[in-house]
Amino acid sequence: MQEHYYKFWREMIKPKGFEVDRDSLRDDYAKFIIRPLERGFGVTLGNSLRRILLSSMMGSAITAVKFEGVLHEFTTIPDVLEDVTDIILNLKEVRFKQYTADSLTLKISKKGPGKVTAADIQTTDKIEVLNPDLPIATLGANANFNAEIVVSFGRGYVPVENRETDLPVGFIGVDALYSPIRKVNYNVSNARVGQRTDYDALTLEVWTDGSLKPEEAVALSSKIMKEQLQIFLTFDETMEPAEEARELGSPTLNENLFRSVDDLELSVRSANCLKNANIRYIGELVVRSEAEMLKTKNFGRKSLNEIKEILGEMGLGLGMKIEGWPPAGWDPSQPPQKRETQQ
């Protein structure tokens, strides 16, 4: 591949990590913010991750059920309010966390009167019910409810007719929705890097059934996408033209470190505080700790929070320990020509 392609590839903005909204974080919900991204990449990544999350995550589901004295689903059980079809629909809503990939057969046995709930499913140490309060059936005084359910581990949605295995005698097949993902939303907004505000910030919200944490789901979906795209890499990613490598100097340093603090577009008060502290470049700023900054004359919490927020959008922060900073021979009054000419 020609050298100018490598140059463009390396100079593209890449996300500096992702933030998790800790205030709303639960075992079944999380909000992630990824920024900055090149313009258009928010929709590209958000839509791709959403589709993979909804279609390709592994989970558990009931795949077959057997009721004592019942031969097919279009019938009823004596002194049970719901018919068999409704009971099966209720069973499909039971969510499990399975600790083995093997199919498991579980039993339900209860006499009336009363309600059968997911808590009545007799589990083992290999599986647990996540929504035990879910109602399954309503029993009359003379009802005797006995059932066996088969719980399997799989991916996506698999209807009965697409399953290859034959059912044991007396079992009724159940369409299986294995996916632990309940809902995925994404939103793209503007992100700022220096003076430019037309970069993307991707907000991704993930709801699960609790059997898989949202952070794990996003990591798995990203891994799947990476492996599916790997086949298109027909060139050596590690190749770097020697001439350009020399021009760039140390490739490990974030280019934003060499930008003027004026590019942060701070309030007048904050900008004057940095000027009084003789901080001219972002690299000189990020190595200062919060405590050091608060000792600066007229520098208060409001200015501190303003700077932290803007640095965070660039993937930087205060109190950073940066290997190789400042670069050998670098004169802040005469920044390298390469740094000045970069967009």
Curated annotation (Swiss-Prot):
<dbReference type="InterPro" id="IPR011262">
    <property type="entry name" value="DNA-dir_RNA_pol_insert"/>
</dbReference>
<feature type="region of interest" description="Alpha C-terminal domain (alpha-CTD)">
    <location>
        <begin position="253"/>
        <end position="343"/>
    </location>
</feature>
<comment type="similarity">
    <text>Belongs to the RNA polymerase alpha chain family.</text>
</comment>
<dbReference type="Pfam" id="PF01193">
    <property type="entry name" value="RNA_pol_L"/>
</dbReference>
<dbReference type="Pfam" id="PF03118">
    <property type="entry name" value="RNA_pol_A_CTD"/>
</dbReference>
<dbReference type="InterPro" id="IPR036643">
    <property type="entry name" value="RNApol_insert_sf"/>
</dbReference>
<dbReference type="GO" id="GO:0000428">
    <property type="term" value="C:DNA-directed RNA polymerase complex"/>
</dbReference>
<dbReference type="InterPro" id="IPR011263">
    <property type="entry name" value="DNA-dir_RNA_pol_RpoA/D/Rpb3"/>
</dbReference>
<dbReference type="GO" id="GO:0046983">
    <property type="term" value="F:protein dimerization activity"/>
</dbReference>
<dbReference type="InterPro" id="IPR011773">
    <property type="entry name" value="DNA-dir_RpoA"/>
</dbReference>
<dbReference type="InterPro" id="IPR036603">
    <property type="entry name" value="RBP11-like"/>
</dbReference>
<comment type="function">
    <text>DNA-dependent RNA polymerase catalyzes the transcription of DNA into RNA using the four ribonucleoside triphosphates as substrates.</text>
</comment>
<dbReference type="GO" id="GO:0005737">
    <property type="term" value="C:cytoplasm"/>
</dbReference>
<keyword id="KW-0240">DNA-directed RNA polymerase</keyword>
<keyword id="KW-0548">Nucleotidyltransferase</keyword>
<dbReference type="GO" id="GO:0006351">
    <property type="term" value="P:DNA-templated transcription"/>
</dbReference>
<protein>
    <recommendedName>
        <fullName>DNA-directed RNA polymerase subunit alpha</fullName>
        <ecNumber>2.7.7.6</ecNumber>
    </recommendedName>
</protein>
<keyword id="KW-0808">Transferase</keyword>
<comment type="subunit">
    <text>Homodimer. The RNAP catalytic core consists of 2 alpha, 1 beta, 1 beta' and 1 omega subunit. When a sigma factor is associated with the core the holoenzyme is formed, which can initiate transcription.</text>
</comment>
<feature type="region of interest" description="Alpha N-terminal domain (alpha-NTD)">
    <location>
        <begin position="1"/>
        <end position="236"/>
    </location>
</feature>
<dbReference type="Pfam" id="PF01000">
    <property type="entry name" value="RNA_pol_A_bac"/>
</dbReference>
<keyword id="KW-0804">Transcription</keyword>
<dbReference type="GO" id="GO:0003677">
    <property type="term" value="F:DNA binding"/>
</dbReference>
<dbReference type="GO" id="GO:0003899">
    <property type="term" value="F:DNA-directed RNA polymerase activity"/>
</dbReference>
<dbReference type="InterPro" id="IPR011260">
    <property type="entry name" value="RNAP_asu_C"/>
</dbReference>
